[in-house]
Amino acid sequence: MKVIVLGSGVIGVTAAWYLAEAGHEVIVLDRQPGPALETSYANAGQVSPGYASPWAAPGIPLKAIKWMLRRHAPLFIKPDGTWQQLRWMWQLLQNCTGTRYEQNKARMVRLAEYSRDCLDQLRADTGIEYEGRQRGTLQLFRTREQLDAALRDIEVLRFAHVPFELLPPSLLTKAEPALEHVKHKLTGGLWLPRDETGDCRLFTVRLADMAAARGVQFRYGQEISHLAIESGNVNGVVVSGVRVQADAYVVALAAYSVDVLKGVLDLPVYPVKGYSITVPIIDEALAPVSTVLDETYKTAVTRFDNRIRVGGMAELVGFDRRLSPRREGTLKLIVHDLFPGAADLSQTSFWTGLRPMTPDGPPIIGATPIPNLYLNTGHGTLGWTMACGSGKLLADIISGKKTDIQHDDLGIGRYAK
């Protein structure tokens, strides 16, 4: 079967890889001149299945107000009066119950754990290198309240058989030796030893090269306009004024999926703006060995080979991609606070990207009411974590194979209930 994949970020490229592996003829279309040049370009770099959690959680509305009042606020909302933003926030509020939080988190952990297994297998099969490390993730708490909140999530980890350790301040160096000098600032940490890190863009570029060697066609610089719908099916995608046709179509355009599907499907995905800095390491002994999550600032500090990436923040500002010097200052403060002397903060590469967020948390993967149209979008901050599992799952669905994990609760149909 001939399949067109719209989008060459980590989600689109992994889908293309697994579709080609399943024997399909695959064409990837993207407006950028190469792969992973938007949302996947400089994300936080963590592959953290155990920390897969929905934003919509009990108490979040009140916490959001408190966060926005902080000097280094992890959250900023700019109401724009659009129906899309208002509806998305209302749907998120409806998911802020204990029952829905547990349900959504379980769905996310299921997919994320599966995805990590798929990544492990892909690495074993191909030998792909992307500055990856298998050294776990450590979530740091600065208050007792944060620690107590994490204890409530542990039951989900137990249910999903995810190994973890709760570490007091004195044992944080078991996971991250460089925290020796700052552990007095912390109340403890939650360590997930099976989590991983890696450069998402490097992974995507190299996997795209491998996919091309398998026959996948990558057509860059293509302005994707809209889907041509005829007799209830997609009969082509209009690209740079030309209709390109296939048997099946996959939309993996992150937050921009909404525009392409306008008038075709009502997609509850909203762009949430995040930031990152990447800095060179000047003292390895003072640098992290893997990923550290700072619960206070809602950021991740991740180690690559010779670089540190600090990523996080959340802004609901539509498709505004302007860089904020204030956000850059906050990210620098975090890496200096936890790992002083580890990096050269005068050599900062500053970036912003738009994460495609669903109001309930899990991504939207699978079939749609249109028989030959499929979705692979809405992964939010967890695109890198969930990419391989999402791609493999989607390829199995399109191929009509029995899937390795339950997926009926990950589709677009869940919003019609």
Swiss-Prot record:
Give the UniProt keywords, A-Z: FAD, Flavoprotein, Oxidoreductase
Cellular component GO terms, alphabetically? cytoplasm; plasma membrane
First-tier enzyme category under EC: oxidoreductase
- Identify the residues that bind FAD: 3-17
The EC number(s) this enzyme carries: 1.4.99.-
| GO biological process terms on file | D-alanine catabolic process
Q: Which cofactor does it need?
A: FAD
Record field: catalytic activity: a D-alpha-amino acid + A + H2O = a 2-oxocarboxylate + AH2 + NH4(+)
- Gene3D superfamilies linked to this entry: D-Amino Acid Oxidase, subunit A, domain 2, FAD/NAD(P)-binding domain
- Pathway participation: Amino-acid degradation; D-alanine degradation; NH(3) and pyruvate from D-alanine: step 1/1
Q: Which InterPro entries match?
A: DadA, FAD-dep_OxRdtase, FAD/NAD-bd_sf
Q: Which NCBIfam families match?
A: PRK00711.1 (NF001933)
Tell me the protein family, please: Belongs to the DadA oxidoreductase family.
The name on file for this protein is: D-amino acid dehydrogenase
Q: Which organism is it from?
A: Methylobacillus flagellatus (strain ATCC 51484 / DSM 6875 / VKM B-1610 / KT)
For this protein's source organism, the top of the classification is:
Bacteria, Pseudomonadati, Pseudomonadota, Betaproteobacteria, Nitrosomonadales
The coding gene here is: dadA
